[in-house]
Amino acid sequence: MSSQYTAIESDVPQAQPAGATGPMDNQMGGEPNSGQINSDPSSWTWIQRLKQSSHPVALLFYIGFRILPIEIYIFGNFFIGFITKKNRFILHFIVLVLLISGDFWNLKNVAGRLLVGLRWWNEVNFIESSSTGEFENVWVFESADPSRYINPIDSKVFWTLLYGQPVAWIVLGILAVLKFEFLYLILILIAIFLSFTNALAFTKCDKFGKANNLATGFLSRASGTILSRLNPFASR
C-alpha cells in the first residue's frame, strides 16, 4: 500500500459578499437590507450554504449522483410508466445501472479530489520474486498538499453522503428481501458493494494522509532542531 502526492490547486474561502453588513456598519447605525446574507451560518438556507462551496458545480453533481439512484429506484417505475408500458423493468434496471456506475466513477475520480483533496485507485502488480507468476493487489492513495484549504461545507456534505448512501441501500435491500424482489436485490447488492468500497477507500485514504502529514511535519521539525544545534553560527 503506497501513497503519492497530487498537486491540486489551492482553494481560498470566498470573499464576503459586497452587500453584507460588517460590524462597523452596525455600530454606525446601518440597517441590514432584506437581500443581505445573514451572518449567522446556523440560519442559512441550503441554497446559501451551497453558494459558500469552493466547488459548487462539483458539489451539486456529487449530491445528484448520490441521491438520484435511490430516488430512481423508489419512484422510477412510476415515471417510466408515463413513457412506456412495455419492458419497464428492463429500462428501470438499465437506468439504475448507469446511475450507480456514474456515481462510483464521479466519487472516485472527481468529487473526492475536488471536495476533500483525496483520491484512490487500485493497481495489480506482478510479484517478481514469485516463481509461479503471482500478482498482488495494491491500493494507492493520493492526498493534496496539507496547506490546501478544505471548505468545511464541501467536507461535511462529502462525508455525510459517503456514509449515508450505503445505509440507505441496506434498508432498501432488506425491503427487497421482504417483498421477494430478488432481481432488484442483485442490483442493490452491487450498489452496496460499490458504495462500501468507496467509503472504505476514502476512509483509509484520509487516515493515511493525516498520518503521512503528521510524520512529515515531525521529521521536518526534528531535522530543523538538529541542524540548528549543529550550526555554530546559530543564535542560542
From Swiss-Prot:
Pfam families: DUF846 (PF05832). GO terms for biological process: protein secretion; vesicle-mediated transport. Keywords: Golgi apparatus, Membrane, Transmembrane, Transmembrane helix. It is a multi-pass membrane protein. The gene is TVP23. It is found in: Golgi apparatus membrane. This is Golgi apparatus membrane protein TVP23. It comes from the Eukaryota. Golgi membrane protein involved in vesicular trafficking. Belongs to the TVP23 family. Its main location: Golgi. InterPro entries: TVP23-like. GO terms for cellular component: Golgi membrane. The chain crosses the membrane at residues 63-83, 89-109, 157-176, 180-202. Residues 1-39 are annotated as: Disordered.
